[in-house]
A protein has these predicted regions:
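Mature catalytic core of soluble alpha/beta enzymes
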Residues: 1-336
C-alpha cells in the first residue's frame, strides 16, 4: 500500500485555473478508490471512472457470480466461454507474466488463495497482531492438492473464447485487475483532456502528467507494520505508476508465526525471503501489479535481474530489517 501522496500546489507558480481541483472516493472490488483531478471542479469525469470500475468489477471479479471470470471457472474442464476483448486481453497479459516469471506469477492460483482465506480471516480477527487459532491454516494435504491445479498453461484460448482444461483450476485476476483498471481510467481521463491528476486504487497509484505547478508528485511508500501510517520512504514521479506488494497488507499469525498472502507457486505456502515489500515504478499500472508480486516471489537478486532486463521499470525493495534497496538512481527516493 502507498502511504501518502503529496500533491500540493504553489500559488505563485500556478495559473488560477490550476488551483481548481476535484476529489472523490468510491468503493469497488473490496477497496477504496480515490481520484483527484487538477484544473477542474467537475465531478463528471470521476463519475465516469467509477462507472468503469463497476463495469470491470462485474466483468473480472471471481466473487461476482455472473462475471466473465466466474463463468470461465464454472465451465472449467467442460467448455469454452466467450469473453469480451478486455477480459481476453487481461488473461493474455496474465499468461505473459506467467511466462516472464517462470510461473511465479500465476493467474490460476484461485483455489489455493481461497484455501488460505487471508482477506476474510485478517479482516475479522479482533487481535492487534492478527493472531488466530491454528485451525485456520490449511493442512499440507489440502495445500498440495490445490497447488497441483495451479498452472497457467491450462488456460486455452480460441479466438474470443477461453477454457480452463483442468476442471479443478480457478482463475483469479486479482493480481493484475486493479492495475489494468487504473490504466483504463487514465486513458479515459486523458481522452477528456485531463492533464494533471492522481488515480489511487487501493494503493495502486497512477499519476497523470505533473502537478499543476510543473513539479513532480511525491508518493510515500508505507513502512511495513507501522500503524501510524508514516512512510518509510518517498519517491518523486510524474506520469508514472507506483504499485507496492507487501506482506503486511493481508496476513495472520498463529502462535506468533506470520502467514501472509503472497503465495509461492512452487510450495503453496507464503513466500519465504528477507523482503517486507516491493514497489514497482512503471508506465503501466497493470505491469506494476504483476511485477510487484513477481519480484517479491523471486527475491531481491533475481528480481533485480528481471527489472534490469526491462525498459522503463524500476523497483524499490524494503527488507525485513527496514533497509531500502533500489534498482537504480533514476528516481529521487527520500527516506525518513
Amino acid at each position: 500500500m502507498l502511504a501518502a501522496i503529496t500533491g500540493s500546489m504553489s500559488a505563485c507558480e500556478s495559473k488560477p485555473n490550476d488551483q481548481q481541483k476535484v476529489s472523490k472516493q468510491g468503493f469497488y472490488f473490496d477497496t477504496i478508490i480515490q481520484i483527484t483531478l487538477y484544473g477542474t471542479t467537475d465531478e463528471k469525469y470521476i463519475d465516469g471512472c467509477f462507472d468503469m470500475a463497476k463495469k470491470y468489477e462485474d466483468m473480472l471479479s471471481n466473487t461476482v457470480s455472473d462475471s466473465e471470470v466466474s463463468r470461465i471457472n464454472a465451465a472449467a474442464g467442460k467448455e469454452y466461454v466467450t469473453v469480451s476483448d478486455d477480459t481476453l486481453g487481461l488473461i493474455k497479459k496474465g499468461i505473459e507474466y506467467g511466462d516472464t516469471s517462470d510461473g511465479r506469477f500465476d493467474i490460476t492460483i484461485g483455489k489455493l488463495s481461497d484455501s488460505w482465506n487471508f482477506s476474510e480471516i485478517a479482516e475479522n480477527t479482533d487481535s492487534k497482531d492478527n493472531e488466530v487459532d491454528a485451525s485456520v491454516v490449511p493442512s499440507d494435504t489440502q495445500i498440495q492438492g490445490e497447488l497441483s491445479h495451479v498452472n497457467y498453461r491450462n488456460i486455452q484460448i480460441n479466438g474470443n473464447t477461453v477454457m480452463l482444461t483442468d476442471s479443478e483450476a480457478k482463475l483469479d485476476l486479482g493480481g493484475i485487475a486493479k492495475g489494468f483498471i487504473a490504466d483504463k481510467m487514465k486513458a479515459y481521463l486523458q481522452s477528456k483532456k485531463i492533464t494533471s491528476g492522481i488515480i489511487n486504487l487501493g494503493g495502486n497509484v497512477l499519476t497523470i502528467g505533473k502537478k499543476s505547478d510543473g513539479s513532480d508528485y511525491t508518493v510515500g511508500i508505507q513502512k511495513p507494520f507501522d500503524e501510524s501510517g508514516e512512510p518509510i520512504c518517498a519517491v518523486k514521479i510524474k506520469d508514472k505508476s507506483v504499485v507496492t506488494s507487501g506482506i503486511y497488507e493481508r496476513y495472520y499469525r498463529v502462535d506468533g508465526k506470520l502467514y501472509h498472502h503472497i503465495l509461492d507457486t512452487t510450495t503453496g505456502y507464503p513466500v519465504k525471503n528477507n523482503l517486507y515489500s516491493v514497489t514497482i515504478i512503471s508506465d503501466s499500472s497493470c505491469d506494476g501489479d504483476a511485477l510487484s508480486t513477481t519480484c517479491f516471489a523471486l527475491g531481491i537478486d533475481k528480481a533485480k535481474e528481471l527489472i534490469n532486463s526491462l525498459s522503463g521499470v524500476e523497483a524499490i525493495f524494503v527488507t525485513d530489517d527496514y533497509s531500502i534497496v533500489t534498482t537504480s538512481d533514476e528516481y529521487d527516493v527520500s527516506t525518513n
